[in-house]
Amino acid sequence: SRVTGKLATALADLGFDDVFDTNWAADLTIIEEGTEFLSRVKAALTGGKSVLPIITSCSPGWIKFIEHNFPDQLDHLSTCKSPHTMMGAVVKSYYAQKIGIDPKKMFVVSVMPCTAKKFEIERPEMMNNGLPNVDAVITTRELAQMIKTAGIDFANLPEGEFDQPLGLSTGAADIFGVTGGVMEAALRTVYELVTGRELPFDKLHVEPIVGLDGVKDATIKIENTLPAYDFLEGVEVKVAV
């Protein structure tokens, strides 16, 4: 069963002052990746310097794999940070200013499903103004142990809510953890930004790139663009997962 609300309550009971939803930052990631994609495509179509295709992954383990084994492909990687490191950067800038706290006094903790996220926050790129975006990462298993050790009766906790405004998110963020989800979310964002219309798939679900079997691909033709994006009129966007 869905226990998101109980997790928010448990984290508050453990002593965290504010509890945010990484899905908010997943939406931010999609906006950043979508606009980066558009800028690269525009450069390629207008004779500028551009590297395509653009490759995206929020997995620090996968990024490290590319760095070690395929360094010649690094220019193809999206420059966007992963959602939880974006969240840390926003918390220590926008949110710190909003609530009037020195970011040096903040300690940001991410709850993540993968131990590679612990390594990720140590990377020099994950710092701003001499401060780490995220100070610590705990895995979901470690969080479960913390809740148990604290004697919290998780099953009977009331449904809590994330603190605002960094607790809101869309369906695009929800599918981030699904195979092909990041690509589908990016397509939704880019298509609507360029045309002013929703992606022409049933329930915005891009069936050709869904599933675990092999490499999946899809082609989406962009037509009737908004004036600002007329350079994309008739362009076919090809994606693969």
Explain the meaning of each model-derived region.
Residues S1-V241:
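Iron-sulfur-associated redox domains of electron-transfer enzymes in respiratory
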